[in-house]
Curated annotation (Swiss-Prot):
Highest taxon above the source species: Bacteria
Enzyme class, first EC level, given as a word: transferase
Keyword NADP: no
Protein source organism: Streptococcus sanguinis (strain SK36)
Recorded GO MF terms: rRNA (cytosine-N4-)-methyltransferase activity
Membership in a protein family: Belongs to the methyltransferase superfamily. RsmH family.
SUPFAM superfamilies linked: Putative methyltransferase TM0872, insert domain (SSF81799), S-adenosyl-L-methionine-dependent methyltransferases (SSF53335)
Residues holding S-adenosyl-L-methionine: 35-37, 55, 84, 105, 112
UniProt-listed Enzyme Commission number(s): 2.1.1.199
This protein's name: Ribosomal RNA small subunit methyltransferase H
Gene responsible for this protein: rsmH
């Protein structure tokens, strides 16, 4: 097992630059990971500024403490080991009621994918795990071996958007009736066997969407993102900014919807004025998502599906 986090940060400058960092501001990196965004953000803060960095993976925090050592020594960064769905309560515990900016880099980090024993990847043989927080109870093994056929179909359709969800769930049900499905490669082979030959010729691994679905279920990724982004919008000071990087359509759809709800107002036309409590909280900084540059796409394969959405707080 390796404890080193080798991670190329996606949309690094675009994300932090869009936060319009104030040297004395209070900022949050909701997804510390390899600490790339945190490091660049901290480089723009003065001694009066502070960064709160969230991650539920102790390995990520341990590595970030080394990478960010100069800022740690100056007392400019606080690490919070928790799921970002507890953003508001954990910041309030730290005495923070308002923030000037926050960034999210959603999904699984590439170091987690690269650590074979974490069981995130269909490319490496490992026990079925997929927990971002290794202390959590629910694992991929539990989902694959104990969820009902109906529940498997539901999560495969909902989180994997795989049109062969029923066939795959049926194959899993058949396989586990003989013996438990214990490893990533076992599961990948079962998924492959459920798909027609012409489907296997298509670009991309046949197990990709199902592994994504199981990972999202194990970590409740969309539920956590939904709760956290709403809390972040409330915590932002007026003129504060929120930047969210997504890697698949479900994350992007969720972010787009939350930003839309907070930046539009649902009142009858012709109303002489909009009451304070109905004023939109956000303004979109960019109507369309910001995409990686040609140079970044050439140097970092993970960047291909990345989209960045940014909004600014305009009303408390």
């Amino acid at each position: 097992m390796t404890n080193e986090f080798h991670h190329i940060t996606v949309l690094l400058h675009e994300t932090v630059d869009q936060l319009a960092v104030k040297p004395d501001g209070i900022y949050v990196d909701a997804t510390l990971g390899g600490a790339g965004h945190s490091e660049y953000l901290l480089s723009q803060l003065g001694d009066e500024g502070h960064l709160y960095a969230f991650d539920q993976d102790q390995t990520a925090i341990d590595n970030a403490k080394k990478r960010l050592a100069p800022y740690v020594e100056r007392g400019m960064v606080t690490f919070i080991k928790d799921n970002f769905r507890h953003l508001k309560s954990r910041l309030q515990e730290a005495g923070v009621e308002e923030i000037d900016g926050i960034c999210y880099d959603l999904g699984v980090s590439s170091p987690q994918l690269d650590q074979r024993e974490r069981g995130f990847s269909y490319k490496q043989d490992a026990p079925l795990d997929m927990r971002m927080n290794r202390e959590a109870a629910l694992t991929a093994f539990e989902v694959v071996n104990h969820y009902s056929y109906q529940d498997l179909v539901r999560i495969f359709f909902k989180y994997g958007e795989d049109k062969f969800s029923k066939q795959i769930a049926r194959k899993i049900e058949q396989a586990r009736s003989v013996k438990p499905i214990e490893t990533t490669t076992e599961l990948a082979e079962i998924i492959k066997s459920a798909k027609p030959a012409k489907e296997l010729k298509k670009k991309g691994h046949p197990a990709k969407q199902i592994f994504q679905a199981i990972r999202i279920e194990v970590n409740d990724e969309l539920g956590a993102a939904d709760e956290s982004i709403q809390q972040a919008i409330d915590l932002l000071a007026v003129d504060g900014r929120i930047a969210v990087i997504t890697f698949h359509s479900l994350e992007d759809r969720l972010t787009k919807q939350l930003f839309k709800e907070a930046s539009t107002v649902d009142v009858p036309k012709g109303l002489p004025f909009i009451p304070d409590e109905l004023q939109p909280k956000l303004e979109l900084v960019s109507r369309k998502p910001i995409l990686p540059s040609k140079e970044e796409l050439e140097s970092n394969n993970r960047a291909h599906s990345a989209k960045l959405r940014v909004a600014r707080k305009i009303h408390k």
